[in-house]
Structure formats: structure tokens, C-alpha cells
């Protein structure tokens, strides 16, 4: 096959789509290039459907090869290891964008693999993987309803930019990744520095317009490859008569069940209704072996119709009756309770409860040694702020093996981390490494948003001087014709009902994090404005409830947290603190029990829960690095006597010379007449030459001291006051 190329211009830069050159045995293979960043994306789907499942078995894997950036992996085996957080999050982005577009009922195992094979240190590859996944599926025979395309939108200096460089992203106050089709925004994930809802909507519409050339390029690529026919598959059964019978037998019962407020009571009743349905159908067929056998064979189909009844009833209840589970209105928030400081030995803690969703959140303050080190294409990255989300099975009354965090937990943690990172203090004001851990105690929807709220309270309880409190809210939107219902603080039951599910986090001033999944077209600017405005009202209500427990960061950190003090030294004196083979710094840390971190710019951070030990370490470091200051008086020790003068140590490691003429205002015949080795003597620094040689004067020190009414001597090795 001759390679085929199509180009689209986005944000003033060309994006190349190419197929037919590599990975030709995949059902769809596309090479996506922006600048010198290249991602190879392949799509393959099994020939036969997977039996016994009620979901679409799609797997998306995004992987970054370090050779793409000219790097050798730093692991022992010099191979790429387990997926990094970025790889996991990008895999989720692609999955969330593409999954809703596959044909309903298609159940063949499908795998999309996106591999970064070249990285130019300027153009990020996640949006290339997103576009490439759509393109690879679009040119294949897999029943995919694309195309869609990905774009990153940033606001730099007040201007919206499509697919910004890494340097531009560092200056941006808004940074979102989104996927869009011709008539809809499909997926949004990103963060911001407290931007308004209007700015966010402007960015989303800007991004949707920006991807249109990429959609044209994908259609052109499909046409050039022969417009492969979509493979045939067995569509889901739709027995109209049986569907109607299931509805008749269950509708009123479902209506009664959804009137129950308590989650387990409601779920228990809905499960009973399903059993009653199957039994009713069996009773109706009693005595007819063939009918009974048919019911047994079609049990999965019957259960599917029952799920449709639940889905249809809840949407009708919301759009027609304007009523929700528990009798809540569209914008009502469940009851909120907050508690802080409940874990006595933890640096900061909170318990945030909203309805039947609860998060226990702990904050730990650490030093620079506790930073997370992550090897990425851009090099080694050091993270000083982390939020980890855990979802144990007991939170929903289930029994499961405890394993390492899955993609969902990593994704929820990243969303909450992004929401709070926007208000974290700069490192020069708060030099701590901060880890927040959210353990979900119980869940009935919006557990990631409970982690945001609980995380904020936990940070404030720990004394972290955040810029402003942050809250998060999960929202849903249902659109039936002209009827629109926007739901605030959705339950687990409502989570899958919506045509648009979105989570918005932020302060009272603006948005710090957003996540959206939109399943339909026709979501206009007006609808987006209504949805985000209602989310803002809900967010402000939650912030008010949080303020009742703790309205601002505590004035001091926990007694059990390390005290970090940062001092500055001249970079050329770093070697004096470290010593040969690290001997000196090891001695200081051993004697004081502190943790010491030295930056290349001369910043020295000393940490210990005991402030006295910190001060002791600082004194030792000052003694090693302080420099003689002209005009200052020091109390030194005579180290050596010579005919022409005396050498005096004014502080550890630093000597100066008192010439014989500077010993006294009277004539001195011999230095030993005035000084002796080991004697302490007041001296004044009168000059320091370019080579660092220090000239001292005893007579000027005596004269200056005589003028002072207090007549006090300075401590040894320190300037006179």
C-alpha cells in the first residue's frame, strides 16, 4: 500500500496524518505528527464477539517510549516500567472520548494502542494520541461513529491558543484538553487559575472550532483508503412485545422503589423487582416447557429491558415531573457535614460527608526529600504536591481484593489534585512537600468531589496557607427535545442518566478544575452557560457549609510536622557544607537530627519537628559559610604568632591577619608582648582583598568598643553588635 498523507492546520501549525507506511497488519494505523513530535496509533478488533458480557470490551493504552526524547530509562533493567500517571490519564482521555461512539451492541474485543515515538520538547503528544485514535478507527472496518479530534486550549496573556507549546502552557492561566466532533464537544479535562465560567465556555467553543480541519483530514484519509465498509455484527435484540410486557410488569414498582431515599433500601427493592419480574414470566409460562426454556435462554435480554425501564422512568421523572430521588429539586444539594482535626497525630485531617458519600482525608507535610520523582519525556520531574484517592470496596458494601490503584482511582485523584494545586502557595513561601490522601468511607455519587472538599479542609487544618478554599460539585444534564433538566450534586443512580455529565471545582472567584463528558449534539452556548451557572451556585453553597467547620488555614502547622527554615548562602560555599564525600553535612544531620536539602542556587532548607534543633543546625551552617564583613567587629581566637603580626580565626575555617602595627595605638616591639596563641581577642575587619585575604585590626576594635556605652563583647565567631 502506498503511504497516504493528509494535513490539517490547527493553531497555525500543521498536523500530519499518515497511513500505509507502518503497522499495516493492524485494522487501522495512523502516524500523527506535530512539529517533531510523532505518535503511532493502531486499532485492532477481534473477529468474533466476546460472549457473556454486558459491556463493550475496549482497551486503550497510551505509552511513551523514552527513546522518543533521546533518553535511556533510569530503571535497573533500563526498560520502561509500569505506566506513569500521565500515561494512565491519557489512556483514560482517549477511552472516554471514543467509547461512546462505537455502535451499540458491538462486543468484539477492541484495542487502541498509542505509542509516542518522537518528542520535540515543545508539542505535547496526548492530543495527538486522541486524534490518532479516532483516525485509526475511522479508516478501519470497526463500527465506529467518528470522527472526533483532540485539541489543547490554553489562555496565555489573555489570548486563547490551540495546541500551545510547553513554554506557553507554563504561562497559561487555563489549560484544557478536549475532544470534539462536528456538532458536539465530546470530552473536556483541564484546569485553570480561578477563571470565570464565561472564559471557560469561550475556551470550549474555541476548541471545537479549532478541530474542524482535523475532522476534514480524517474524512479525506478514510476516502483515500477506500472507505472500508463497517463490519457486520449482530445488533442487540429488540423484542417490542417482550419489552412492553417487562414495562407493564415493573413500571409502577420501579416508581415506588425510586421513592425510597436510602440507597441500600432502594437497591434492595430494585433487585427484588427484577426477581419478581422473572418469576412472573415463569408463572405465566407454567406448564409450557418450551416457553420456560425460552425465558431461561433470554434472561439476560429480559434483564436488559428491565434496566431500560429504570432508565426511562428516572429520565421521565426528572424531565416531566421535575422530581429527583429523595424528593430533591434540580439544584438541591444533599445535607453536608464537615469535621476537621479528628486524627490527633496527623498533620491535617478532615471528614467530609455529603448525603451518603463520605471522604476521610489526611494531609502530610514533608521535606524536599519526600518529593515524588517521575521520569518523563521532558526529563526528571519533581512533584511537591500530590493527592491520592482510594476507593475501598467497603465504601459501597462490596467484597473485593485490595489491589494497587486502578485507572479510575488515578483519574479521580488527578482531578482533585488539579483542583487544589491552583490555590497552593509558592515554594518560596511554603517549602513543604504536601501529600493529601482521600479514603472514601462510603459512596453514593460524587466521591471525587468529596475528595476536593475534604482535601481543602484537610490542607487548611494542616496550616497550609492556600490562596482560597476550594469546593467541587458533580452535575448532570438531561435533554429530551426542548425539555432540559440540569441536576446538581448527582447520585450514583443519576450518574449514567445524563446526556452531559460534568464536574466543576473552584473557589468563590472561579474555576480551578473541570471534567466533562457530553454524549449528545446540540448542547448550545446557552445550555453550557445555564449548566455552569448552576454549578457555580452549588459550589458556593458547599463553600459556605465548609466554612462552618474551618473558614481559613490555621495560623501554624501541626506540632508533629517538620519545621522548615530556609537560609541563603553563596553557591560557591555549598562545598563547605557538604564537605569531602558528604562528611560535613552528614555530621550536621547526625548531631542535630535534622534533614538538610541544598539547592544549586544556594538555598538551604533545614527541617525538624524540633525548632531548637533547626536553629542549632543553622548556627553550624552559618559557622561554615559566613564571610568576613568589612567594618564588623568579631571575637576571634589567636591561632599563630609571627614576627609581623598574628593570625586570628574569627569564625570556624576563616582566619585573618592582624599586622603588628594594628595591635595597639602605641608602639609594639613584639607581637608576643600583646597576644599569645589560643587567646581570644576583639578584632575589626578593615579589608578583604580579591583573593579573600582578610586584614584585621585590634586597635580599631578597641577604639570602637570604647565608644559604645554598653561595652558588651560579641559572642565568639559572631559580629559585634
From Swiss-Prot:
Keywords, in A-Z order: Cytoplasm, Magnesium, Metal-binding, Nucleotidyltransferase, RNA-binding, Transferase
Subcellular location: Cytoplasm
Residue ranges crossing the lipid bilayer per the database entry: none
Gene3D superfamilies documented for this protein: GHMP Kinase, N-terminal domain (3.30.230.70), K Homology domain, type 1 (3.30.1370.10), Nucleic acid-binding proteins (2.40.50.140)
Domain KH: 562-621
Enzyme class: transferase
Residues reported to bind Mg(2+): 495, 501
Pfam families with a match to the protein in the record: KH_1, PNPase, RNase_PH, RNase_PH_C, S1
Keyword Cytoplasm: yes
Protein EC: 2.7.7.8
GO terms, biological process: mRNA catabolic process; RNA processing
The keyword Metal-binding is assigned to this record: yes
Organism superkingdom: Bacteria
Cofactors that this protein relies on: Mg(2+)
UniProt catalytic activity: RNA(n+1) + phosphate = RNA(n) + a ribonucleoside 5'-diphosphate
GO molecular function: 3'-5'-RNA exonuclease activity; magnesium ion binding; polyribonucleotide nucleotidyltransferase activity; RNA binding
Main location: cytoplasm
NCBIfam families with a match to the protein in the record: polynuc_phos, PRK11824.1
Alphabetized HAMAP family for the sequence: PNPase
Family: Belongs to the polyribonucleotide nucleotidyltransferase family.
Function comment: Involved in mRNA degradation. Catalyzes the phosphorolysis of single-stranded polyribonucleotides processively in the 3'- to 5'-direction.
The protein's name in its UniProt record: Polyribonucleotide nucleotidyltransferase
Organism (species): Anaeromyxobacter dehalogenans (strain 2CP-1 / ATCC BAA-258)
Native organism taxonomy: Bacteria, Pseudomonadati, Myxococcota, Myxococcia, Myxococcales
Gene transcribed to yield this protein: pnp
Amino acid at each position: 500500500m502506498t503511504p497516504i498523507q493528509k494535513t490539517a492546520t490547527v493553531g497555525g501549525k500543521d498536523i500530519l496524518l499518515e497511513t500505509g507506511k507502518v503497522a499495516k497488519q493492524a485494522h487501522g494505523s495512523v502516524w500523527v505528527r506535530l512539529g517533531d513530535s510523532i505518535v503511532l496509533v493502531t486499532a485492532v478488533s477481534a473477529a468474533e464477539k466476546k460472549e457473556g458480557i454486558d459491556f463493550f470490551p475496549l482497551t486503550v493504552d497510551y505509552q511513551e517510549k523514552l527513546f522518543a526524547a533521546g533518553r535511556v530509562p533510569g530503571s535497573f533493567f533500563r526498560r520502561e516500567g509500569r505506566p506513569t500517571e500521565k500515561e494512565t490519564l491519557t489512556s483514560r482521555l482517549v477511552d472516554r472520548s471514543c467509547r461512546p461512539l462505537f455502535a451499540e451492541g458491538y462486543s468484539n474485543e477492541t484495542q487502541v494502542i498509542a505509542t509516542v515515538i518522537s518528542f520535540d520538547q515543545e508539542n505535547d503528544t496526548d492530543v495527538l494520541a486522541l486524534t490518532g485514535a479516532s483516525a485509526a478507527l475511522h479508516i478501519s472496518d470497526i463500527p465506529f461513529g467518528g470522527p472526533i479530534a483532540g485539541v489543547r486550549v490554553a489562555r496565555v496573556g489573555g489570548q486563547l491558543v490551540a495546541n500551545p507549546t510547553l513554554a506557553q502552557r507554563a504561562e497559561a492561566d487555563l489549560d484544557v484538553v478536549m475532544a470534539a466532533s462536528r456538532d458536539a464537544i465530546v470530552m473536556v479535562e483541564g484546569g485553570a487559575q480561578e477563571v470565570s465560567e464565561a472564559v471557560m465556555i469561550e475556551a470550549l467553543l474555541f476548541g471545537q472550532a479549532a478541530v474542524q480541519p482535523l475532522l476534514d483530514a480524517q474524512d479525506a484519509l478514510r476516502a483515500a483508503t477506500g472507505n472500508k465498509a463497517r463490519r457486520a455484527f449482530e445488533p442487540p435484540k429488540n423484542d417490542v412485545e417482550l419489552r412492553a410486557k417487562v414495562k407493564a410488569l415493573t413500571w409502577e414498582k420501579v416508581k415506588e422503589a425510586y421513592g425510597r431515599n436510602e440507597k441500600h433500601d432502594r437497591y434492595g427493592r430494585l433487585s427484588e423487582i427484577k426477581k419478581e419480574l422473572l418469576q412472573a414470566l415463569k408463572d405465566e409460562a407454567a406448564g409450557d416447557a418450551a416457553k420456560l426454556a425460552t425465558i431461561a435462554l433470554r434472561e439476560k435480554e429480559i434483564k436488559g429491558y428491565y434496566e431500560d425501564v429504570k432508565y426511562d422512568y428516572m429520565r421521565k421523572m426528572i424531565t416531566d415531573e421535575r422530581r429527583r430521588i429523595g424528593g430533591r429539586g434540580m439544584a438541591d444539594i444533599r445535607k453536608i457535614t464537615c469535621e476537621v482535626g479528628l486524627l490527633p497525630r496527623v498533620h491535617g485531617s478532615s471528614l467530609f460527608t455529603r448525603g451518603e458519600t463520605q471522604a476521610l482525608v489526611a494531609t502530610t507535610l514533608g521535606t524536599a526529600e519526600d518529593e515524588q520523582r517521575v521520569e518523563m519525556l521532558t526529563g526528571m520531574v519533581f512533584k511537591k504536591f500530590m493527592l491520592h484517592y482510594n476507593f475501598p470496596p467497603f465504601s459501597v458494601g462490596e467484597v473485593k481484593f485490595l489491589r494497587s490503584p486502578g485507572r479510575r482511582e488515578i483519574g479521580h485523584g488527578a482531578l482533585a489534585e488539579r483542583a487544589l494545586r491552583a490555590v497552593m502557595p509558592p515554594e518560596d513561601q511554603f517549602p513543604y512537600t504536601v501529600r493529601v490522601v482521600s479514603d472514601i468511607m462510603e459512596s453514593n455519587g460524587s466521591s471525587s468531589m468529596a475528595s476536593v472538599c475534604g482535601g481543602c479542609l484537610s490542607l487548611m487544618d494542616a496550616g497550609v496557607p492556600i490562596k482560597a478554599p476550594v469546593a467541587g460539585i458533580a452535575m448532570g444534564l438531561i435533554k429530551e427535545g426542548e425539555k432540559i433538566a440540569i441536576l446538581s450534586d448527582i447520585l450514583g443512580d443519576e450518574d449514567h442518566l445524563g446526556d452531559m455529565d460534568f464536574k466543576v471545582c473552584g473557589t468563590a472567584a472561579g474555576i480551578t478544575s473541570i471534567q466533562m463528558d457530553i454524549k449528545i449534539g446540540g448542547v448550545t452556548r446557552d445550555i453550557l452557560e445555564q449548566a455552569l451557572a448552576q454549578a457555580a451556585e452549588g459550589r458556593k453553597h458547599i463553600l459556605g457549609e465548609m466554612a462552618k467547620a474551618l473558614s481559613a488555614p490555621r495560623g501554624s502547622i501541626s506540632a508533629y510536622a517538620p519545621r522548615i527554615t530556609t537560609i541563603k548562602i553563596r553557591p560557591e560555599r555549598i562545598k563547605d557544607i557538604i564537605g569531602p564525600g558528604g562528611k560535613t553535612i552528614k555530621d550536621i544531620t547526625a548531631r542535630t537530627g535534622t534533614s538538610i536539602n541544598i539547592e544549586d542556587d544556594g538555598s538551604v532548607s533545614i527541617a525538624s519537628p524540633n525548632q531548637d534543633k533547626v536553629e542549632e543546625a543553622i548556627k553550624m551552617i552559618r559557622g561554615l559559610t559566613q564571610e568576613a564583613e568589612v567594618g564588623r567587629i568579631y571575637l576571634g581566637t589567636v591561632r599563630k604568632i609571627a614576627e609581623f603580626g598574628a593570625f586570628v580565626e574569627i569564625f570556624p575555617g576563616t582566619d585573618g591577619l592582624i599586622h603588628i602595627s594594628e595591635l595597639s595605638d602605641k608602639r609594639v616591639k613584639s607581637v608576643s608582648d600583646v597576644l599569645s596563641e589560643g587567646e581570644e581577642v576583639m578584632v575589626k575587619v578593615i579589608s578583604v582583598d580579591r583573593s579573600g585575604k582578610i586584614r584585621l585590626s585590634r586597635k580599631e576594635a578597641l577604639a570602637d568598643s570604647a565608644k559604645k556605652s554598653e561595652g558588651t563583647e560579641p559572642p565568639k565567631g559572631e559580629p559585634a553588635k
